[in-house]
């Protein structure tokens, strides 16, 4: 590199470092952009003089560089423009210029060509056209730049450009779905992100409007309040993106888990632990993108309407205050929301009741939103407003859209102060992926979908149950309030009771409705916990559950709410296995509440008789049956459900001395049920778990049983890895059975190291503290319940089984609840030694070492 360029590069580095240092001290986005852009332009001036002095070419800044919004590690978007087609020599010179930019550690993105070539290249390229929309002259022949701008503006179809940018935004938003996009959002491309702000400004500029907020204010595109809010939201997002680049030291626009604490700390969230810093950062982020989405709802249709060819304007009278304009509702006088605040809810009520109205007309929305900021205690105390708000739930029609609309524009938080506290609140528990307010509204949506025929195919049984449920509005309210007390510290289910009861009293619910609502809020985790963590074949478990539930109405409501809650927490959580657990508990509890539960001895006898009837029909002699029952022992019928007993009996009755493996694909699921029968021996359960983990199976449930003649009869439910299609299941089943058969006949299977597969980035940087509780079983000496919560990982169950074995603890039952990256496992174990506090403490400590 020539000496003069080396000097220019050194000057650039000094100016860049000074811009970053000044920013970190003064924290002003606009100053950083100005200083860093100037540093890059100074370097470009030296390079241009070196390569293109006195040439007919010109250099333009385009894209983000063109608008003066250059982030620390962003591409430097440039265009080299020639009045005539480029010769081979000029193209080689441009290539050397670009290579020097790379050598200077910039990230150049360079277009080159003649005026005609560049115009043609963007004719059908919306991205390229957008980049040139923000072009500005840097060096060279200015007349060439003017000619290019004139020609591009002349060929641009403004209406088509606007429509294409809006379609592009829709596609961008559609890609920002799923847990990764929610938990580690792309600050540039997510809904409400920086690219949405750019899109608004591009649409304005294409129409010949200004692209800076003060000028848009003068042109009456924005109100003063909107300009202030958009500017504030933009600065928030720009601050985060600058810090993100500085901490990542690369062009990283995703708020990755490992970067969230670093960004939060560098932005000044001090005095908090890493998790709280990250949560506070993400809460600021979610509120910023919410502001952008709010303004987009007003400005996008307003700007679009200026250029789009719309259908014939059809205006219909609704009442003295409102008219319908095509599919929108408009106020005759937009000051009505200030003069008569009860209309803040009335217009929403009309929109909810009318399927032919899908939105508020932009000017009406602007006025309505302005008035909502005046919602206060007096507004809440107005009985008319309370009736209308409760009516949103009683009506049900369009409930999800109504609540999301009210949440987007801040009405829910102003009307209900408890709601304000959960807006944008993240939960780093390794299974929730949405902020609390979004999660709640997703659960409301799920409950509402169960009530609609059009969605009955998703969950036919639950849908039929919901459609016959009399108090649907109370279920909607239970979904709305179930997590409203999150983030306060303590048990949110208990704390939410007071919020639910206060709402019920203020909104004219009957005492019976209030009781059901409060009970559902308090117990919304009950059914999920029992179904996923406890042995519902144990009559004492069912008895305790039903004593809490007491009525069929509560049971049905809790079942529907639980399904909707799990499905609204994380798409990965809902599967056929979890559905079958809840349905089994629901039906078992229903029989119990009807009086058909029977006492334990009757239940066990019925299970044995059902199996005996099956074997008799298969012509198995009664003498042979008795031998099997004696080998299994009476405890067997207390620990297994009827379907398992029938399956085991059919496979074991003719020979219960020879080891066998059997498996079956569970109907309508991606899971196998596997039984392993073989002579008892050391570490068998742990070694079996390792085989499943090595094949990539998730163990959903496991039951370890030792027969009277010292054989193990272990039954597993394992989930097939998601990358496999159903047509692959038989081959997977055969391969698994082959390895298990080899194992039970004494052939050594290679042991696999427990930590051979890495845990996720989320688990590494946002871990949960492992917890262990050991509780003696009532009425069963030497039996204990062990509850473990930890980060999920491969071989976790096998490792815990090894610890149990090392401490002379016999594992008899395991219920595995895998909540995405969080494991909540329940074990029933037998050990006379655990009466000794030292041994119990040693077991806990060793388990914690495995889990940490």
Swiss-Prot record:
It holds the Pfam family GlnD_UR_UTase. The keyword Kinase does not apply. Residues 1-318 are annotated as: Uridylyltransferase. InterPro entries: ACT-like_dom_sf (IPR045865), ACT_dom (IPR002912), HD/PDEase_dom (IPR003607), HD_domain (IPR006674), NT_sf (IPR043519), PII_UdlTrfase/GS_AdlTrfase (IPR013546), UTase/UR (IPR010043). Residues 436-558 form the HD domain. Keywords: Hydrolase, Magnesium, Multifunctional enzyme, Nucleotidyltransferase, Repeat, Transferase. Residues 319-672 are annotated as: Uridylyl-removing. PANTHER family: BIFUNCTIONAL URIDYLYLTRANSFERASE/URIDYLYL-REMOVING ENZYME (PTHR47320), BIFUNCTIONAL URIDYLYLTRANSFERASE_URIDYLYL-REMOVING ENZYME (PTHR47320:SF1). Has four distinct domains: an N-terminal nucleotidyltransferase (NT) domain responsible for UTase activity, a central HD domain that encodes UR activity, and two C-terminal ACT domains that seem to have a role in glutamine sensing. This is Bifunctional uridylyltransferase/uridylyl-removing enzyme. The gene is glnD.
């Amino acid at each position: 590199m020539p000496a003069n360029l080396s000097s220019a590069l050194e000057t650039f580095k000094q100016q860049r470092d000074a811009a970053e240092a000044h920013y970190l001290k003064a924290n002003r986005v606009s100053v950083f952009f100005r200083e860093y852009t100037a540093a890059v332009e100074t370097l470009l001036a030296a390079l241009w003089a070196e390569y293109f002095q006195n040439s007919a070419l010109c250099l333009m800044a385009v894209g983000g560089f063109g608008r003066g919004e250059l982030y620390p590690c962003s591409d430097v978007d440039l265009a080299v423009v020639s009045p005539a087609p480029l010769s081979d020599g000029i193209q080689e010179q441009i290539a050397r210029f670009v290579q020097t930019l790379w050598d200077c550690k910039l990230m150049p993105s360079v277009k080159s060509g003649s005026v005609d070539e560049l115009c043609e290249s963007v004719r059908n390229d919306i991205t390229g056209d957008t980049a040139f929309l923000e072009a500005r002259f840097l060096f060279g022949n200015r007349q060439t730049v003017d000619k290019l701008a004139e020609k591009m503006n002349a060929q641009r179809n403004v209406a088509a450009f606007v429509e294409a940018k809006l379609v592009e935004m829709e596609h961008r938003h559609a890609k920002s779905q799923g847990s990764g996009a929610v938990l580690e959002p792309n600050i540039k491309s997510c809904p409400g992100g920086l690219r949405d702000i750019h899109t608004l400004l591009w649409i304005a500029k294409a129409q010949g409007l200004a692209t800076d907020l003060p000028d848009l204010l003068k042109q009456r595109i924005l109100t003063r309040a909107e300009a202030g809010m958009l500017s504030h939201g933009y600065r928030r997002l720009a601050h985060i993106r600058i810090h993100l680049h500085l901490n990542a030291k690369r062009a990283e626009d995703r708020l990755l888990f490992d970067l969230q604490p670093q960004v939060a700390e560098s932005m000044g969230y001090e005095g908090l632990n890493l998790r709280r810093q990250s949560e506070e950062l993400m809460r600021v982020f979610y509120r910023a993108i919410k502001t952008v989405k709010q303004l987009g709802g007003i400005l996008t249709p307003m700007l679009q309407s200026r250029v789009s060819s719309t259908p014939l304007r059809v205006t219909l009278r609704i009442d003295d205050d409102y008219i319908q304009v095509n599919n929108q509702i408009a106020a005759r006088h937009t000051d009505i929301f200030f003069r008569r605040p009860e209309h803040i809810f009335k217009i929403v009520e009309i929109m909810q009741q009318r399927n032919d109205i899908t939105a508020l007309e932009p000017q009406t929305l602007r006025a309505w939103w302005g008035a909502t900021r005046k919602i206060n205690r007096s507004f809440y105390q107005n009985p008319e407003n309370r009736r209308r708000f409760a009516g949103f739930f009683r009506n049900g029609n369009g409930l999800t859209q109504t609540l999301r609309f009210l949440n987007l524009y801040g009405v829910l938080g102003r009307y209900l102060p408890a709601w304000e506290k959960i807006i944008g609140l993240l939960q780093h528990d390794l299974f929730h992926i949405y902020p609390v307010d979004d999660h709640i509204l997703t659960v409301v949506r799920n409950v509402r979908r169960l009530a609609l025929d059009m969605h009955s195919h998703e969950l036919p049984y639950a849908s039929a149950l919901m459609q016959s449920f009399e108090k649907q509005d109370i279920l909607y309210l239970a979904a709305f309030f179930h997590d409203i007390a999150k983030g306060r510290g303590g048990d949110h289910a208990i704390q939410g009771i007071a919020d639910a009861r206060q709402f019920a009293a203020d909104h004219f619910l009957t005492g019976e409705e209030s009781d059901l609502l409060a009970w559902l809020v308090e117990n919304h985790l009950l059914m999920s916990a029992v179904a996923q963590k406890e042995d519902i074949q144990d009559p004492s478990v069912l008895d305790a559950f039903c004593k809490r539930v007491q009525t069929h109405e509560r049971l049905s409501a809790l079942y529907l709410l639980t399904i909707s809650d799990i499905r609204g927490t994380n798409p990965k959580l809902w599967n056929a296995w979890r559905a079958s657990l809840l349905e089994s508990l629901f039906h078992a509890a229903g029989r119990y509440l009807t009086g058909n539960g029977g006492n334990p001895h009757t239940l066990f006898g019925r299970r044995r008789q059902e199996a005996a009837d099956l074997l008799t029909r298969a012509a198995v002699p009664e003498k042979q049956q008795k031998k099997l029952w004696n080998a299994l022992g009476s405890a067997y019928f207390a620990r297994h459900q009827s379907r398992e007993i029938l399956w085991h009996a059919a496979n074991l009755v003719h020979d219960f001395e020879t080891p066998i493996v059997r498996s079956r694909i569970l109907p309508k699921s991606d899971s196998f049920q596997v039984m392993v029968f073989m002579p008892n021996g050391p570490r068998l359960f742990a070694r079996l778990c390792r085989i499943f983990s090595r094949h990539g199976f998730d163990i959903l449930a496991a039951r370890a049983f030792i027969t009277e003649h010292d054989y193990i009869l272990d039954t597993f439910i394992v989930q097939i890895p998601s990358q496999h299609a159903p047509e692959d299941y038989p081959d997977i089943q055969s391969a698994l059975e082959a390895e298990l058969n080899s194992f039970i006949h004494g052939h050594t299977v290679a042991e696999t190291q427990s930590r051979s597969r890495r845990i996720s980035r989320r688990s590494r940087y946002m871990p949960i503290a492992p917890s262990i509780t050991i509780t003696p079983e009532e009425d069963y000496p030497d039996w204990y319940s062990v509850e473990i919560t930890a980060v999920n990982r491969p071989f976790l169950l096998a490792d815990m089984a090894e610890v149990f074995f090392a401490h002379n603890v016999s594992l008899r039952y395991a219920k595995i609840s895998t909540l995405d990256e969080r494991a909540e496992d329940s074990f029933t174990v037998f050990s006379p030694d655990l009466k000794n506090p030292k041994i119990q403490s040693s077991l806990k400590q060793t388990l914690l070492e495995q889990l940490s």
